């Protein structure tokens, strides 16, 4: 029983360490999109905090794959893991 408890503790701690630091990720976005994602980047983009979680995730995945043609966003999205993208998509709509 003791081994099971120790193993569960290790797994829980490892999960915390692997969790995406969303606040660190959004710092790189603020210059163009605003701290609360309230701006149109370069006067062109959608206002991201008005988008749904699903829309944000789909757009970031499309930028990452190159399906959305925008060299700046494609370069940024390629740096993100799928987990990072899901975390951002979940977090950004909370900034309204």
UniProtKB/Swiss-Prot annotation:
Presence of the UniProt keyword Mitochondrion in the record: no
Keyword terms: Electron transport, Heme, Iron, Metal-binding, Periplasm, Signal, Transport
GO CC annotation: periplasmic space
Record's function text: Natural electron acceptor for a formate dehydrogenase.
Protein family according to the UniProt entry: Belongs to the cytochrome c family.
Compartment(s) where it occurs, according to its Swiss-Prot or TrEMBL record: Periplasm
Positions contributing to heme c binding: 29, 32-33, 73
Protein name as annotated: Cytochrome c-553
Secretion signal, residue range per the UniProt entry: 1-19
Superkingdom of origin: Bacteria
Post-translational modification (record): Binds 1 heme c group covalently per subunit.
């Amino acid at each position: 029983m003791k081994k099971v408890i120790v193993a569960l503790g290790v797994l829980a701690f490892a999960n915390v360490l692997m969790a995406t630091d969303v606040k660190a990720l959004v710092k790189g976005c603020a210059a163009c999109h605003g701290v609360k994602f309230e701006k149109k980047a370069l006067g062109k983009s959608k206002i991201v905090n008005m988008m749904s979680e699903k829309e944000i995730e789909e757009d970031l995945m499309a930028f990452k794959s190159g399906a959305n043609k925008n060299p700046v966003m494609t370069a940024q999205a390629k740096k993100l893991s799928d987990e990072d993208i899901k975390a951002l998509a979940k977090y950004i709509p909370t900034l309204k």
